């Protein structure tokens, strides 16, 4: 009996388009949801990333909400990824913050 080929599941790649760094500054408020603290990133570091972002991307998705990926250094200089939802074109709700992953780093370097 011939052996069947193993199917390898590919992880989905992030699809995004770059945004100007001044994009985050247009929000009147930045709120942080409790899920953003899941990976141990502090409130101060989340605000530091938003204020000193090096790259900002709008993530492509099927939902109606605008999801924004913000990449920048924390207070110690480590790169973090922060994801926020735009709410009513006025505020940004941060829902995710963690040390930058390899897949996101590839996106930044343009190798995706």
Question: Which residue ranges define each predicted feature?
Answer:
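Ribonuclease/tRNase effector modules and their secretory precursors
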Residues: 1-112
């Amino acid at each position: 009996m011939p052996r069947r080929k193993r199917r390898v599941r590919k992880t989905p790649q992030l699809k995004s388009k770059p945004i100007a760094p001044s994009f985050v500054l247009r929000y009147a408020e930045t709120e942080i949801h409790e899920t953003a603290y899941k990976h141990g990133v502090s409130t101060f570091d989340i605000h530091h990333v938003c204020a000193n972002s090096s790259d900002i991307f709008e993530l492509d998705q099927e939902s109606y909400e605008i999801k924004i990926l913000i990449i920048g250094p924390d207070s110690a200089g480590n790169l973090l990824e922060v994801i926020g939802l735009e709410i009513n074109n006025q505020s940004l709700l941060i829902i995710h913050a963690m040390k930058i992953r390899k897949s996101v780093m590839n996106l930044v370097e343009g190798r995706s």
